[in-house]
């Protein structure tokens, strides 16, 4: 081939090259402007053929098998402290087993706008008490030294915790500015048992306010969930009036979740998404990628993320598991609200 090309006069070579480039540009324009359904056809091919193969490759998660995560980048490894280790002496009475749940606090010792320093020890104690009562593991990851903002450090901290607890099934990431108010209520009894989760998941509801296309269409949760669908969920989260709220969120410990988290923290993707925080980034990912959206389950806010004020479906009521003081800094009421509800812990 090289010999044949060398025999072609230079002027003809450049002529052929120019014609080829023009033809390529014309073909690209034809596809782009005439076959407007091409993108949808490719997406359909992905959903029907490629995605199932990816699903088969990832497999369904199981607490009976642990997996090895790739090492984190060294600059994203933070100090991790186990404040409570679950007991494995007794037979599991719940599904998932209590000892396979990790309660995780990721913090630099502060909450939004430098609040929370004087309530940090109480936040730790609250989680120790709850984990002890429910036989969960409780892990604290101190992200003070990480070279990224605290809200972006959550995802590598979850990955780090997944690596530390390879046999754990679920990791519950709960922000520092939240109090577990009902320590008698387990996650399993509240919603995490597969049969309970099937009843609790919100259906036919907008999953994110970010449009999925130029027409402004939105992505919705499924109309129903089978138990098989439940097994494939990797993230459980709730919404507030602004959209998805990552102040209280659960991650299934699986290779699919690890990949999800790795993409979630990608700075290049975050720049493309124009995401100001981890919640914006999550909204972008599930609006643009149907396969990632299928991994996310939406549950009522008061199940894991009740607020101190708001409409009935949002505002904390006695017996609720958690209260989250999101936005308390706006009126400088964080310490006041903390002390008020800390006294109501049951």
Swiss-Prot record:
This chain's source organism reads Schizosaccharomyces pombe (strain 972 / ATCC 24843) (Fission yeast)
What are the UniProt keywords, alphabetically? Glycoprotein, Glycosyltransferase, Golgi apparatus, Membrane, Signal-anchor, Transferase, Transmembrane, Transmembrane helix
InterPro entries referenced in this protein's UniProt entry, alphabetically: Glyco_trans_34 (IPR008630), Nucleotide-diphossugar_trans (IPR029044)
* Residues that span the membrane, as ranges: 12-32
Glycosylation site list = 64, 142, 224
Where is it located? Golgi apparatus membrane
Residues in compartment: Lumenal = 33-346
> What family is reported?
Belongs to the glycosyltransferase 34 family.
A GO CC term assigned to this protein in UniProt: Golgi membrane
Q: Which PANTHER family match?
A: ALPHA-1,2-GALACTOSYLTRANSFERASE GMH3-RELATED (PTHR31306:SF2), ALPHA-1,6-MANNOSYLTRANSFERASE MNN11-RELATED (PTHR31306)
Q: Which GO terms describe its biological process?
A: protein N-linked glycosylation; protein N-linked glycosylation via asparagine
Membrane topology qualifier: Single-pass type II membrane protein
E.C. number(s) listed in UniProt: 2.4.1.-
Q: What's an example of a GO molecular-function annotation for this chain?
A: alpha-1,2-galactosyltransferase activity
- The name under which this protein is listed is Probable alpha-1,2-galactosyltransferase gmh2
